[in-house]
Amino acid sequence: MLITINNSHYEIIAEHGDGFNEEAFKSRFSEILNRYDYILGDWGYGQLRLKGFFDDQNQKASYDNKISTIKEYLYEYCNFGCSYFILRKIKK
């Protein structure tokens, strides 16, 4: 599935528990997320949270913001068993 927002295109690369809701994603999306290569959306207490991650090859990214740390982030900061999704930005 292709998602377009603010002239950027994303594809869903992972989804757990029917986590993706396009309407909720578009209403929570902030322009600051445009700079990231990946966006994680997770649900907690009926609220969608969005967090950006960079590609591992991005030398300016801190360790915690690299996509290879996303499983650790899910374990540490998300509710156990929560619904979530991961989007990857499609570069032209």
For the regions a language model picked out, list residue spans one by one.
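N-terminal interaction modules that seed assembly of large macromolecular complexes
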Residues: 34, 41-58
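Helix-rich interaction surfaces within compact, conserved domain-sized segments
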Residues: 62-92
